[in-house]
Regions:
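Hydrophobic targeting segments
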Residues: 2-6, 23, 33-37
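Well-ordered, non-membrane alpha-helical segments in soluble/globular domains
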Residues: 16-22, 102-119, 216-224
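Conserved catalytic core of nucleotide-sugar-dependent glycosyltransferases
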Residues: 93-174, 178-179
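C-terminal catalytic/acceptor-binding lobe
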Residues: 11-19, 168-169, 174-292
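Short, solvent-exposed loop/turn segments at secondary-structure junctions
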Residues: 9-11, 43-44, 65, 89-91, ...
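A structural signal for short, well-ordered beta-strand segments and their strand-loop junctions
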Residues: 37, 83-87, 125-129, 187-191, ...
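Short, well-formed alpha-helical segments that are part of the catalytic scaffolds
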Residues: 6-27, 43-50
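Active-site-proximal specificity loops/subdomain of glycosyltransferases
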Residues: 38-86, 91-107
Length: 292
């Protein structure tokens, strides 16, 4: 059974309105057998008191810091276990019933089926598309194998401690991505599911729990980028000049241009819409309506 790992910090009175509410709305999840929540020792009694009725497999204590939370979750599961990692501020997961209709977006209620689908397609780590904008999704398959970043808000992987554990919080997603690109030649991408989040706008959260919570935010995050670039795989796949993200008030790394990456690392694997149709021959449709 696919496990769901959620890391949270300082949001014992918010998490139920976000990720836990989203997961509880799913018709095909059994959180009592799937959900593992990682919190700090200081937060543990607050979460236990706030969430007495929430079904979960376990609540574990991890050191402060986003990377420590993820590392603790990775250590919790046995090698090879399929796990979806999620942040604590996901208020909904959106998709489109019709790939040509921007007004057909809706809240997904069958994430269990979709997680199983993703793990059937990919033995490699995979992420989800960042944007709900239909214009940027036109022409993309539901799932594909490509060179792209695995965003940190939610992603999936089979547990592999050498691949998934990192030494720093800021840029941990880029470090994992670089390792996966080096090992597998690409990562999985689920293009038509988008998590509704509010990164950096809610009190608490992983951005407040470690090396992104300092007063000198810009300087600290730029230093973290430069530290990440000391790893050979990160330096290979990412631009060497950290980029300042105005909306987030921090520095981050960007993948090298896709054309440059494709020339150096040619791709030969892609999953198209026909993948779903082949698995469901009695439902020939160009719409996702029957899928959901």
């Amino acid at each position: 059974m696919i496990k769901i790992a959620v890391r949270s910090y300082g949001r014992h009175n918010q998490i139920w309105k976000k990720t836990l509410s989203t997961l509880s709305a799913q018709k095909d999840l059994d959180l009592g057998r799937q959900l593992v929540l990682a919190v700090t020792k200081e937060d543990y009694p607050l979460y236990k008191a706030e969430l007495p009725e929430v079904p979960m497999l376990d609540m574990i204590i991890v050191p402060k810091g986003g990377h420590n939370a993820t590392n603790g979750l990775v250590d919790y599961f046995p090698d090879g276990e399929p796990v979806i990692f999620m942040d604590d501020d996901i208020s909904a997961v959106k998709c489109y019933r019709d790939i040509m209709d921007k007004d057909s977006r809706f809240d997904v209620t069958n994430l269990g089926e979709l997680f199983e689908y993703a793990f059937r397609q990919f033995s490699e780590p995979f992420g989800f598309d960042f944007t709900p904008n239909l214009m940027f999704k036109q022409g993309k398959p539901f799932a594909e194998f490509k060179m792209r970043k695995i965003g940190g808000a939610w992603w999936g992987a089979h547990i592999d401690k050498t691949l998934l554990k990192t030494e720093q919080s800021h840029e941990d997603d880029n470090i994992r991505t670089a390792r996966a690109l080096h090992r597998h030649g690409g990562v999985g991408s689920i293009n038509w599911l988008v998590a509704a989040t509010a990164v950096g706008t809610n009190k608490g959260g992983m951005q407040s729990s470690g090396d992104r919570g300092t007063d000198e935010r810009a300087a600290a995050t730029k230093a973290a980028c430069l530290t990440a670039l000391e790893q050979a795989h990160v330096a290979t796949y990412y631009q060497h000049d950290p980029t300042f993200i105005d909306s987030m008030d921090f520095y981050s790394l960007r993948l090298r241009g896709i054309k440059e990456l494709r020339k150096q690392f040619p791709m030969n694997k892609e999953l198209k819409w026909s993948t779903y149709l082949q698995e469901n021959p009695d439902k020939p449709t160009s719409s996702l309506e029957d899928f959901f």
